[in-house]
């Protein structure tokens, strides 16, 4: 799904762009960017982010964040193993949240007063900045104004915006990293309150969550996403409730059972269908776009009906009620390791550098001098005073705040530009574009993916055993014939067999540890017992009994937690093994009914 055009008011967007003016003008020279960041850091200057309120960018140098020993170029950079291409990113500073330091807010404006003056104060001068070495989020600037965000705690790189104008219009509202548990972001979806309270109180196990969902099946929850419109979430609870919505209402029994097998095969554990997100049509049929699934650990996933894929949606009920469908809007903008993405069922990062050859389509961008580029003209065009003016009396007037924007405002998308080659022009221009791509590849080595994104690169001994076990169970004809893989790999996992194999390997590990550390049992052998008749001996025995009872309770809690962690670890290993086996092969997708299947035969 495509984002809305902006999440902030016109005055806030223009103020943010004015704060980024010098970055827009000096973006071609890395030394100028570093000098500008150094000068801002010396003055303790911070730039308020347009959305959400309270966030600001503290300009800090690279050495103050990562240390003087950190590398600024190449694969040894803090983000070198995460970014898809070998592009040099420049650190702008750290992102901080504070409710005390806010920008100067103007009073309410009318449509004519939205033309803010040029003397607005778009910077914040902070007296005390938190230690940048302990900051979690780092803002980075790439080529052609691409904006990136590095989450140092999770080791994840986010592709925030395709330009500084995009960053000014959207801010951090769709950055997944700001909605973590430590931020305590308030819930957006709060109604109906009795349903929300029951869901939050029974999110510890999948059985309790299913019981609550079945209690309210048929109810509609307005699921809210930050900055986007509200979508209806129809609660189901059971698989049979899916047959009342489109397109599952048109599916045969065998086809529907294959779909349920696909859900279990993709999540590698028992699955609960929480509900569907879509639209209620005037005909009375609910049109489903996404199916919300819950796995054993009460983590949420979505099944895209049109793409026939399953990906991660939220880590918990609270996160689902906070971010809504944010991951669907930001699909492909999260860059991490292949094994972790396979375990979490995250959408792999989609390389945004594919459009760079389009920018260099005439082979002249690298030859043009920096002084002759039209960055100043672009900046003046972006902050023009009539850009966000709303005139209701002009019904035929269109501006850049409309959903369908002009070419100048979304020129980053090649599909919208009229000079992008269409299908009829591809054959005659194929040779020219091939020569152009070769020229671009020779000019810069940062085009094309250079990172080996493969599950096989991060193999562990546990994962290798899971891959071998999975390869032995998969029917050979399913891997050779993609048409037979509608319901997945047709593998039914057995926890008992995997427990036996893990116990065998763990026993060997325990024996090795005991042989290496024989002094663990010395204390029990050399302890001298007290005389049974003395008062001190009775008190000591009672104290020992109480300690043993408390230790037994703690041991049971630890075993229960370890059992849950082991079960979840087993599920994650299954997902990574499944991704490793299917790497380089067609992805299994279930068969879904087409519009022809539910239309009358005369149509």
Curated annotation (Swiss-Prot):
Q: Which domain of life is it from?
A: Viruses
Q: State the Pfam families in the record.
A: US22
Stretches the record annotates as Disordered:
496-536, 549-568
Q: Which segments show compositional bias classed as Polar residues? A: 517-533
Acidic residues composition bias: residue spans: 496-513
InterPro entries per the UniProt record, alphabetical: US22-like (IPR003360)
- Family affiliation: Belongs to the herpesviridae US22 family.
Protein's UniProt name: Protein US26
Query: In which organism is this protein found?
Result: Human cytomegalovirus (strain Merlin)
């Amino acid at each position: 799904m495509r984002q809305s055009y902006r999440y902030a008011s016109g005055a806030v967007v223009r103020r943010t762009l004015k704060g980024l003016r010098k970055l827009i003008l000096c973006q071609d020279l890395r030394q100028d960017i570093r000098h500008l960041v150094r000068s801002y850091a010396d003055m303790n200057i911070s730039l308020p982010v347009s959305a959400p309120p309270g966030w600001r960018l503290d300009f800090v140098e690279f050495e103050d964040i990562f240390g003087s020993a950190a590398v600024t170029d190449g694969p040894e950079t803090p983000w070198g193993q995460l970014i898809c291409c070998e592009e040099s990113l420049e650190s702008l500073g750290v992102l901080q949240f504070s409710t005390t330091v806010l920008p100067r807010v103007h009073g309410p404006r009318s449509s004519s007063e939205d033309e803010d003056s040029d003397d607005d104060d778009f910077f914040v001068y902070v007296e005390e900045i938190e230690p940048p070495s302990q900051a979690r989020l780092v803002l980075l600037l790439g080529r052609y104004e691409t904006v990136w965000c590095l989450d140092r705690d999770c080791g994840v790189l986010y592709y925030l915006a395709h330009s500084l104008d995009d960053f000014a219009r959207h801010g951090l509202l769709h950055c997944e990293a700001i909605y973590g548990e430590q931020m305590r972001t308030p819930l957006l979806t709060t109604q109906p309150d009795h349903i929300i309270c029951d869901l939050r109180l029974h999110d510890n196990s999948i059985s309790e969550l299913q019981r609550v969902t079945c209690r309210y099946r048929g109810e509609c929850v307005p699921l809210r996403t930050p900055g986007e419109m509200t979508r209806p979430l129809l609660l189901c609870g059971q698989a049979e409730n899916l047959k009342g919505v489109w397109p599952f209402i048109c599916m045969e029994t065998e086809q529907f059972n294959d779909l349920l097998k696909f859900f279990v095969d993709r999540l590698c554990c028992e699955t609960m269908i929480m509900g569907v997100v879509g639209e209620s049509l005037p005909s009375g049929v609910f049109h489903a776009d996404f199916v919300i699934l819950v796995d054993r650990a009460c983590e949420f996933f979505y099944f895209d009906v049109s793409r026939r894929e399953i990906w991660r949606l939220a880590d918990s009920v609270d996160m689902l009620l906070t971010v809504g469908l944010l991951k669907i809007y930001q699909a492909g903008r999260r860059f991490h390791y292949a094994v972790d993405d396979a375990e979490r069922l995250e959408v792999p990062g989609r390389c945004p550098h594919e459009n760079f050859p389009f920018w260099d389509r005439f082979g002249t961008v690298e030859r043009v001098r920096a002084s002759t580029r039209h960055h100043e003209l672009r900046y003046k065009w972006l902050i023009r005073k009539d850009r966000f003016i709303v005139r209701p009396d002009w019904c035929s007037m269109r501006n850049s705040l409309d959903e369908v924007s002009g070419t100048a405002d979304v020129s980053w998308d090649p599909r919208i530009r009229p000079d992008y080659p269409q299908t009829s022009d591809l054959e005659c221009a194929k040779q020219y574009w091939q020569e152009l791509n070769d020229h671009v590849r020779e000019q810069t080595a940062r085009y094309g993916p250079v990172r080996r994104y493969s599950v096989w690169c991060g193999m562990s001994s546990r994962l290798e055993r899971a891959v071998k076990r999975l390869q032995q169970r998969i029917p050979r004809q399913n891997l050779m014939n993609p048409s037979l893989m509608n319901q997945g790999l047709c593998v039914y996992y057995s926890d008992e067999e995997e427990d036996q194999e893990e116990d065998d390997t763990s026993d060997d590990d325990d024996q090795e540890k005991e042989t290496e550390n024989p002094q663990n049992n010395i204390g029990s052998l050399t302890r001298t017992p007290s005389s049974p008749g003395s008062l001190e001996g009775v008190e000591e025995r009672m104290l020992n009994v109480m300690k043993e009872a408390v230790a037994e309770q703690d041991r049971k809690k630890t075993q229960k937690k370890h059992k849950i962690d082991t079960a979840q670890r087993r599920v994650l290993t299954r997902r990574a093994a499944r991704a490793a086996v299917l790497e380089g092969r067609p992805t299994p997708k279930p068969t879904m009914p087409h519009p022809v299947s539910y239309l009358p035969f005369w149509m």
